[in-house]
Amino acid sequence: MSRLEIALSSTLDHLLKHIFLGTVFLTSLYALYRWLLPKPLPGIPFNQKSAQSIWGDVVELRDDPSGLAKWCSKQLENHGSPICQALMGPLSKPVVLVADVGNAREMLMGRSDFDRSAYIIDRFPLFGEFHLNMKTGDNWRQSRNWLKDLLAPQYLHNVAGPAIHSSVLKLIKLWEHKSCVGDSRAFNMVSDLKTLALDVIVAFHFGSDFQDSALDRQVDHVGKLDGSKLPCGEHNEVEFSKAPLHEFQQALTDVGDKMAAIYTTKWPPLIVAWWVRYVSPYYRPFFQAKDRFIRKHINLAVRRYRNDEEPSTGIDYMVYREEKAARKAYRQPMFDKQIMIDEAYGNLIAGQHTTSAALVWILKLLADYPSVQEKLREELQGIFVGAMQENRLPTAAEIITSKLPYLDAVLEETLRLRAAMLVPRDATKDTELLGRRIPKGTVVLLVCQGPDYKPSPPSKYWSDVKASRVYPGKGNPDLEVFDPERWLVRNEKGDLEFDGSSYPQLAFGLGIRSCWGRRLAMVEMRIMTTLMTLKFELKDVPEGLRGHEASYDISYRAKKGFLRLKSLGEVP
């Protein structure tokens, strides 16, 4: 063989080798691409275009300015189906979206094949061993058992009710000061309602053991302000400075805000939470101090129990419950365990944020719908005629025990429109939902305001769902409109009654994993709405301060929470 032939043969060998290696590389790259592509669940609609991208629906979701809840509703609308799936990128399982809440709720109630979702648990690592962050099991049942007495009518009526009433009266005083100092101009109510919820939840747990009222501090602070020197915003709203809080209350507020930020962060929540808890020079000291603070109050409760004193605080009832459970199980009480500290701490955080968000929506909607506000005021004046004649506001007991159908309808309608937008659940085993197979470990998101909320549903399926959605009252057929009448009926005697049982309400979740604090929240909303409606006329605010844009984290929170008040005196 000549040198030329040898050279050509060698070159050809090298070329074939490179072609082979290139083919292997490209084939491997393609195989990797195929392996990274989302794996849709069979039989459930999905976006075909997203299935050809390793990022699935993530890019579209990230770039959608309307947020997760609205994006989920749009997917269901586009597919014309009660169920579809979102493809969440490489190595992630699809998330199943369900919007026919009427049917899905009945399927999920009482079923053991759906549980608290890791989707939520993974986003709230700062809660620690709080029951909200647990799968259903022995630890969860133990933690929930500690709270049973706090939901009893005796505690809600005799302890929580008066504490809420007292705090709302302080808020009324604060807002009277703000309205006077600010010359009846609009101001932001969000911080004040968070302060109200903070005072209530702290009083609920610690009672007279903690005397420092955040609202008292704000009242004293605003009372010293000079209205002529207050800054104004773009729409002539008054901007009030805030008084410093007790360090424990300030930390509760700040940590709650940080949890909300972690919920929506693009960074891994566990990494952010680790930095906050163990590295941050601002937050790290609080996590050390809050354990000592709560443990001190647990020890006070233990001392009262061993002195045979009657329980008077939320912590007392938790301690007494644990003592009884320990005796029954022949074990030592868990007073010094982290799980008990985290249970108290978690309730303080969650109770403050979720309730305050709902209170903002109630007042915004009443201001936006003056006819509803006036009708509510007429009901309250008629029911509390004795208080009106005595030139006073009704007591907590009067508000809690009175039959107030229109007030109940206002609260129910607010929760229908402006509470939970998404309810996540995890499939604990292979199961079915709406006739589709759901594998174990799949995240299911119940979309509370689906395409059937639109005035003109986008498909026959959603038209049929809308037609089957029966409310007790006649109400506005447009489900995006605030109309309490949809919850009201006439009984056999012709009297107006509230009926909240005819259609599912997911504001507080569902099943055994529903929100334990629902009764407390409803008492707080009832008292606050009653007193504010009797004390103030809620006026409209400038156009630039209106709007119902919201963010979704621990709760569904209004981005604009402005209020303009006209005092009605001691009584209207």
Curated annotation (Swiss-Prot):
Q: Is Iron there in the keyword field?
A: yes
Biological-process GO terms, alphabetical: mycotoxin biosynthetic process
Residues reported in the UniProt entry to bind heme: 515
Report the cofactors: heme
What are the protein's GO molecular function terms?
Answer: heme binding; iron ion binding; monooxygenase activity; oxidoreductase activity, acting on paired donors, with incorporation or reduction of molecular oxygen
**This protein's UniProt keywords:** Heme, Iron, Metal-binding, Monooxygenase, Oxidoreductase
**InterPro entries the record matches:** Cyt_P450, Cyt_P450_E_grp-IV, Cyt_P450_sf, Cytochrome_P450_monoxygenase
Q: Which Pfam families match?
A: p450
Domain of life the protein comes from = Eukaryota
**Which EC numbers characterise this protein's activity in its record?**
1.-.-.-
Keyword hit for Iron: yes
Q: In which pathway does it act?
A: Secondary metabolite biosynthesis
According to its UniProt record, this protein's enzyme class is oxidoreductase
Q: Which family does it belong to?
A: Belongs to the cytochrome P450 family.
Q: What does this protein do?
A: Cytochrome P450 monooxygenase; part of the gene cluster that mediates the biosynthesis of the 6-methyl-2-pyrone derivative xylariolide D. XilC hydroxylates the 5-alkyl-6-methyl-2-pyrone backbone called prexylariolide D, produced by the highly reducing polyketide synthase xilA, on its side chain to form xylariolide D.
The protein's name is Cytochrome P450 monooxygenase xilC
